[in-house]
């Protein structure tokens, strides 16, 4: 019985130490998600203001990045995951959304080139021996605009190339949208070719009268410079959304782990108390039994 009590005490110490770790991770994630939320809010106006003049230009300009191919045959999919785990279903939901998008594009006759941000997504694809054109890692917790530019560069290069030279006709992105501390949703969005109606709706300019611009030297030259910045800003915003979602998911997972550890400690404490009481009861029974046997022996010797 004493050995069982020692086992319970050892498990209580182990779970208590784990609870301290998960509580600390919960607090760190809570701090990071607040910072990430602020960055998301700060990056949105930039993407919106960058888009509005593009709307006024692109609506009357034929440009490779705003014109859909007659028969698109190849698409690039950028999947955003995290470098670390301990975030519940955050990564699995994003990967599932990317796989569903890939299946849909392939059914429509497109060859899909996959680009991945985050070690978790890359590990998933490598384990299943799926081809990844290019991957990026090491910055998913706190992405910067420089990271977004690094991710966007090969994608912009691919969309500008002809498909016969290894280019793509479309660019899609899959990331986790931060809705609230309790809700994060995996979504997919087509970045290129730009859909004027979709971008207008996203930017809130659907019913807005757009200003007229006079561009020098030409609208096409402006689009050449403007659209890469647009792609970079959209990817940056998606990286920030994913970072905020990951921290929120980690906070929620660690809170659940902390609560479960507390419940397990209570259960083990009850079992330890029961084992201690049983041990005490057994000792008392042995003492009483020994005293009774001694009394019987003394009575027999007197007779």
Swiss-Prot record:
NCBIfam families: ATPsyn_F1gamma, PRK05621.1-2. Keywords: ATP synthesis, Cell membrane, CF(1), Hydrogen ion transport, Ion transport, Membrane, Transport. Its main location: membrane. This is ATP synthase gamma chain. It is a peripheral membrane protein. Gene3D superfamilies: 3.40.1380.10, ATP synthase, gamma subunit, helix hairpin domain. Belongs to the ATPase gamma chain family. One of its GO terms (biological process) is proton motive force-driven plasma membrane ATP synthesis. GO terms for molecular function: ATP binding; proton-transporting ATP synthase activity, rotational mechanism. Produces ATP from ADP in the presence of a proton gradient across the membrane. The gamma chain is believed to be important in regulating ATPase activity and the flow of protons through the CF(0) complex. F-type ATPases have 2 components, CF(1) - the catalytic core - and CF(0) - the membrane proton channel. CF(1) has five subunits: alpha(3), beta(3), gamma(1), delta(1), epsilon(1). CF(0) has three main subunits: a, b and c. Pfam families: ATP-synt. HAMAP family: ATP_synth_gamma_bact. The gene is atpG. It is found in: Cell membrane. InterPro entries: ATP_synth_F1_ATPase_gsu (IPR035968), ATP_synth_F1_gsu (IPR000131), ATP_synth_F1_gsu_CS (IPR023632).
């Amino acid at each position: 019985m004493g050995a069982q009590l020692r086992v319970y005490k050892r498990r209580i110490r182990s779970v208590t130490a784990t609870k301290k770790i998960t509580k600390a991770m919960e607090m760190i994630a809570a701090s990071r998600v607040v910072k990430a939320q602020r960055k998301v809010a700060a990056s949105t106006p930039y993407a919106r203001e960058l888009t509005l003049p593009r709307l006024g230009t692109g609506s009357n300009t034929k440009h490779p990045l705003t014109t859909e191919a007659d028969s698109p045959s190849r698409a690039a999919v950028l999947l955003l995951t995290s470098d670390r785990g301990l975030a519940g279903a955050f990564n699995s939901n994003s990967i599932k959304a990317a796989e569903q998008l890939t299946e849909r594009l392939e059914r429509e006759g497109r060859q899909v080139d996959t680009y991945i941000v985050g070690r978790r997504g890359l590990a998933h694809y490598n384990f299943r021996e799926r081809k990844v054109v290019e991957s990026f890692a090491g910055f998913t917790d706190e992405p910067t605009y420089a990271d977004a530019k690094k991710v966007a560069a090969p994608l912009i290069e691919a969309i500008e190339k002809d498909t016969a030279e290894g280019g793509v006709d479309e660019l899609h992105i899959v990331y986790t949208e931060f809705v609230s501390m309790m809700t994060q949703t995996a979504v997919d969005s087509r970045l290129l070719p730009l859909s004027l109606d979709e971008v207008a709706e996203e930017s809130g300019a659907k019913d807005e009268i757009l200003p007229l611009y006079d561009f020098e030297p030409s609208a096409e030259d402006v689009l050449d410079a403007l659209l890469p910045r647009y792609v970079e800003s959209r990817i940056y915003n998606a990286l920030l959304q994913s970072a905020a979602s990951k921290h929120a998911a980690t906070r929620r997972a660690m809170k659940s782990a902390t609560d479960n550890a507390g419940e397990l400690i209570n259960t083990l404490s009850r079992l330890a108390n029961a084992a201690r009481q049983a041990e005490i009861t057994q000792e008392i029974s042995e003492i009483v039994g020994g005293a009774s046997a001694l009394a019987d022996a003394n009575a027999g010797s007197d007779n």
